[in-house]
Amino acid sequence: MGGAAQNNNLSNNNNDSPPASPVLEGRDSPDLPLTMAASTILTALPRDATAALAAAGGFPQEKVVVRFRPVGSAPAIRRDLVKVISTHKFDSVVAYLRKMLKVPETDGVFLYINNTFAPALDEVVGNLWRCFKDSSDHLIVSYSMSPAFG
């Protein structure tokens, strides 16, 4: 009787076979990115995606125009419009302004974009220009000898 009951159970469970790849319950598997070589669906990037990726890291202009504006009692500089290479970091703008104002290393100079925020020194000037340029395509950099905003 035990053998007949066992055969009966086996024939009823044919539809309840385990999945081809077992799933571990209670453990989420992380979503890992697939490389192009491992993907069976996507064998090449579409043409428009390839063009977009090629242009993503570049800047539309090799140099951008930065306009300096003094705030408060900060002295004005002669050349308030300068061209800066798009790939330079913002610290090069700070160094240029320090040189023009003849500010010693011990004194502070505070720079702000559009009188709003002080960017990090490692920000790329081209990215700042792309996001915060004015209607004249100038990046407005206000400067002060003491904290002016915030």
UniProtKB/Swiss-Prot annotation:
Q: Is Protein transport one of the keywords?
A: yes
Q: Which Pfam families match?
A: APG12
Q: Which domain of life is it from?
A: Eukaryota
Q: Where is this region: Disordered?
A: 1-29
Offer one example of a GO biological process linked to this entry.
protein transport
Which SUPFAM superfamilies did the record assign? Ubiquitin-like (SSF54236)
The UniProt record lists the Glycyl lysine isopeptide (Gly-Lys) (interchain with K-128 in ATG5) crosslink at: 150
- Coiled-coil annotation: which residues? none
Q: Which UniProt keywords apply?
A: Autophagy, Isopeptide bond, Membrane, Protein transport, Transport, Ubl conjugation pathway
- Where along the chain is composition biased (Low complexity)? 1-18
Self-association state and partner proteins as the record states:
Forms a conjugate with ATG5.
Q: Which family would the database say this protein is a member of?
A: Belongs to the ATG12 family.
Q: What does this protein do?
A: Ubiquitin-like protein involved in cytoplasm to vacuole transport (Cvt), autophagy vesicles formation, mitophagy, and nucleophagy. Conjugation with ATG5 through a ubiquitin-like conjugating system involving also ATG7 as an E1-like activating enzyme and ATG10 as an E2-like conjugating enzyme, is essential for its function. The ATG12-ATG5 conjugate functions as an E3-like enzyme which is required for lipidation of ATG8 and ATG8 association to the vesicle membranes.
Record's protein name: Ubiquitin-like protein ATG12
Q: What is the protein's species of origin?
A: Chaetomium globosum (strain ATCC 6205 / CBS 148.51 / DSM 1962 / NBRC 6347 / NRRL 1970)
Q: What's the source species' lineage?
A: Eukaryota, Fungi, Dikarya, Ascomycota, Pezizomycotina
Q: Which gene encodes it?
A: ATG12
